[in-house]
């Protein structure tokens, strides 16, 4: 079920910044996105230098479709969970409420990015997973 509050916020951000591309949104919000070696299991995390958030993404995904999901996921932490730090870990058996919320926002961002890129909604969730590298939940 789609949370209409989340959908409204995502649509507002897309309209305000003229895109749903999470990398462009981060840039327009002056949020640095850095690629670094985070090991095999850590896909991304948010760090802060003072009050300034930095999205750290695993360099192993720099040229892969999944870079969009991981960027959108970490961006969601910055926008909707300001001040909290976290990391997207593939092997985590326990997904916190914050991780679940960030994933929901990321998927809403990517549905809209798909519509922006293809002028239509994805026909299936699998189509969205394939295009933007959304990991199986």
Can you describe what each PLM-predicted range is?
Residues 1-137:
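Active-site hotspot residues in diverse enzymes, especially metal/ion-binding acidic/histidine motifs
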């Amino acid at each position: 079920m789609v949370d209409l509050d989340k959908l409204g916020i995502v649509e507002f951000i897309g309209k305000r910044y003229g895109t749903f591309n999470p990398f462009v949104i981060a840039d327009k919000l002056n949020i640095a996105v850095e690629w670094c070696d985070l090991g095999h299991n850590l896909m991304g995390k948010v760090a802060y230098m003072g009050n300034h958030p930095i999205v750290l993404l695993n360099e192993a995904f720099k040229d892969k479709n999944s870079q969009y999901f991981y960027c959108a996921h970490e961006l969601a932490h910055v926008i909707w969970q300001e001040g909290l730090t976290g990391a997207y870990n593939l092997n985590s058996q326990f997904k916190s409420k914050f991780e679940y919320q960030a994933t929901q926002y990321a998927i809403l961002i990517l549905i809209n990015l798909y519509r922006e890129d293809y002028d239509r909604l994805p026909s299936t969730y699998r189509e969205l997973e394939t295009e933007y590298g959304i990991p199986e939940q």
